Curated annotation (Swiss-Prot):
Active site, UniProt feature: 197
Subunit and partners: Interacts with THI1. Interacts with FD and FDP.
Lineage, opening ranks: Eukaryota, Viridiplantae, Streptophyta, Embryophyta, Tracheophyta
Superkingdom of origin organism: Eukaryota
Protein name: Calcium-dependent protein kinase 33
Subcellular location: Cell membrane; Nucleus; Cytoplasm
Binding site for Ca(2+) 4: 494, 496, 498, 500, 505
Annotated coiled-coil segments of the chain: none
Induction comment from the UniProt entry of this chain: Up-regulated by abscisic acid treatment and drought stress, but not by thiamine.
Covalent lipid adducts (N-myristoyl glycine), residues: 2
Tissue specificity: Expressed in primary roots, leaves, inflorescences, siliques and guard cells. Expressed in the shoot apical meristem.
């Protein structure tokens, strides 16, 4: 079981997010330079603890008594939903100021390593808070169900969204973005932190203002640097991971590589190392051939290409440092970067690259819900055997025990990865339909008959097309829909641009790409 990457590279895969593939470490234990007991509660006065005797001690992830974030903040609309939690808009009761509250379900923090990682992320955000281009951290609160992180509200949206919305795009604009990203790297390294997961999705705009700052918002894989230590655990996101990470011998230079990948995308619209599978991406990274021949590279300045080459140098000892990048003639403030517009096709490719095709994921779930019982009799029995408390859902502990009974020797991290891959709605457990979707052979799920049934499910009026209204209704039924997502899906799937999806387009979507994904069994 698992996939061939685990055999060749010793790593496990996370579910795809926002059109990119991610890798998760085998061993997530990381070093800290800070006492967990010094984690801020976010208040200047002694907090009104609720039953501290009951809620203190080892049970608390933050190693402090529980504290209700709602005593200090009013939580309102949902801003976003990720693999590990939900982000809400929140308002501080004492000042009326607006912040973002990231709520991480404790069901997702099942291993000792998960809890250590959570504490470390908070420590690092506290350590870096107040620096330019880094989100300001307000405080951490823990209750019975979740750990809540309150931080600066970045109301300007995602980095790529802003670039795409502008229309006009130039080397100077790309240099401005890259300068802020590398400034984050420079600050992190100066303050003894290695980020380890730089990618566009981890940067937001501070406001909708034209001159808004770019802010780094996610430090979940970051570590305090131990001088002289060689890091070996494989972390990061597939397109952005440095070759030395795959070789399991790396240091802080990996952050410059990731920033160089982002710069390549900013200038061309696509990553330099591309393949349909994670294995293909990693093989391309290790081979290290960078394409400067295809469009738009012939029209990109030599100075820009020089910086990309220096940042994507295979040997980390010869790779340019963050401080040196900031002094490069093309990147520095008022430098050589031209304001001449870059080919508009770059923006189009960038949009396609970042668009996650949520419709395909939803279609597989619909197929699993409606598949004939006789086809899945064995899987049904397997689900019942693993669901030992007959709750109708499989918890992490049940999955771990069930795999052990089948003779599996997976590590805790690998079991956790399988759990996350199967848990589509992110509630910390696997329901029956999620189990079927994750365990059935993909070719059976995607048979012509099943694909047609899924199309009919979305095509409510039987017109032969999935309209915008039908798409919106289907996505919202599963809590996946917003206007931006619908537009991205249509852009990605609607080949003839008539504003609706016909059966041929739907089939092409279901057959395309099919990157290798982890299966439970």
């Amino acid at each position: 079981m698992g996939n061939c990457l685990a055999k060749k590279y010793g790593l496990v895969m996370k579910p795809q997010q926002n059109g990119e593939r991610s890798v998760e470490i085998e061993n997530r234990r990381r070093s800290t330079h800070q006492d967990p007991s010094k984690i801020s509660t976010g208040t200047n006065q002694p907090p009104p603890w609720r039953n501290p005797a009951k809620h203190s001690g080892a049970a608390a992830i933050l190693e402090k008594p529980y504290e209700d974030v709602k005593l200090f903040y009013t939580l309102s609309k949902e801003l976003g939903r990720g693999q590990f939690g939900v982000t809400y808009l929140c308002t501080e009761k004492s000042t009326g100021k607006r912040f973002a509250c990231k709520s991480i379900s404790k069901k997702k923090l099942v291993t000792k390593g998960d809890k250590e990682d959570m504490r470390r992320e908070i420590q690092i955000m506290q350590h870096l808070s107040g620096q330019p281009n880094i989100v300001e951290f307000k405080g951490a609160y823990e209750d019975e169900k979740a750990v809540n992180l309150v931080m600066e509200l970045c109301a300007g949206g995602e980095l790529f969204d802003r670039i795409l919305a502008k229309g006009h795009y130039s080397e100077r604009a790309a240099a401005s973005v890259c300068r802020q990203i590398v400034n984050v790297v420079n600050i992190c390294h100066f303050m003894g932190v290695m980020h380890r997961d730089l990618k566009p999705e981890n940067f937001l705009l501070s406001s909708k203002d034209e001159k808004a700052l770019i802010k780094a918002t996610d430090f979940g894989l970051s570590v305090f640097i131990e001088e002289g230590r060689v890091y070996k655990d494989i972390v990061g996101s597939a397109y952005y991971v440095a070759p030395e990470v795959l070789k399991r011998r790396y240091g802080k230079e990996i952050d410059i590589w990731s920033a160089g990948i982002i710069l390549y995308i900013l200038l061309s619209g696509v990553p330099p190392f591309w393949a349909e599978t994670e294995k293909g991406i990693f093989d391309a990274i290790l081979e290290g051939e960078i394409d400067f021949e295809s469009q738009p590279w012939p029209s990109i300045s030599n100075s820009a290409k020089d910086l990309v080459r220096r940042m994507l140098t295979q040997d980390p000892k010869r790779r340019i440092s963050a401080a040196e990048v900031l002094k490069h003639p093309w990147l520095r403030e008022g430098g050589e970067a031209s304001d001449k517009p870059i080919d508009s096709a770059v923006l189009s490719r960038m949009k396609q690259f970042r668009a996650m095709n949520k419709l395909k994921k939803l279609a597989l779930k619909v197929i699993a819900e409606n598949i004939d019982t006789e086809e899945i009799q064995g899987l049904k029995a397997m689900f019942a055997n693993i669901d030992t408390d007959n709750s109708g859902t499989i918890t992490y502990e049940e999955l771990k025990e069930g795999l052990a009974k089948l003779g599996s020797r997976l590590t805790e991290a690998e079991v956790k990865q399988l759990m996350d891959a199967a848990d589509v709605d992110g509630n910390g457990s696997i329901d029956y339909i999620e189990f079927i979707t994750a365990t059935m052979h993909r070719h059976r799920l995607e048979s012509n008959e099943n694909v047609y049934k899924a199309f009919q499910h979305f095509d409510k009026d039987g017109s032969g097309y999935i309209t915008t209204d039908e798409l919106e209704a289907a996505l919202k039924e599963y809590g996946m829909g917003d206007d931006a997502t619908i537009k991205e899906i249509l852009s990605d799937v609607d080949a003839d641009n008539d504003g609706r999806i016909n059966y041929d387009e739907f089939c092409a979507m279901m057959r395309s790409g099919n990157p290798q994904q982890p299966r439970l069994f």
